[in-house]
Amino acid sequence: MNINFLAHVHLINKSVSYLLEQTNKSTICLVGSMASIIGLPNASAYCASKAALTSYAQTLYFDFQNTNIDVKLVTPGFVKTRLTDKNTFKMPMIVTSEYAADQIYKATESNKFETVFPKRFYWVMKYLSWLPMHKSAIQLLR
């Protein structure tokens, strides 16, 4: 929670007054996770922190509507890194860190609030979130 959520809150709180003073448009880009869509096995704190970050980004988006600050949320699926190399569970539709970095950069340049990737995995996660909480639903990700 400290890194995935509170660090963002503290950094943005420290930066907002400076950003509002700027004449040019500023962009705050928060990187969430598809783990914010549904709870995943053995990842309760991670999922909760990313869900909090998603809600925070949505709130900031509305709070800064009539200012020079543009808020973006990037919601990736699994990204291959040294951390994910240690995972012992399936990571469907995993993308490279280079691909993720490219998508995050493009998100900062887009007109959309939220950028998700891979899109097909996003829709799978959304579909699972609409199902009743049942062990067989989460088995799709194991």
Ranges and model annotations:
Residues 38, 59-70:
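Active-site-adjacent segment of SDR/Rossmann-fold oxidoreductases
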Residues 40-44:
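Active-site loop immediately N-terminal to the catalytic Tyr-X3-Lys motif
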Residues 33:
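Residue(s) in the substrate-gating loop at a strand-loop-helix junction
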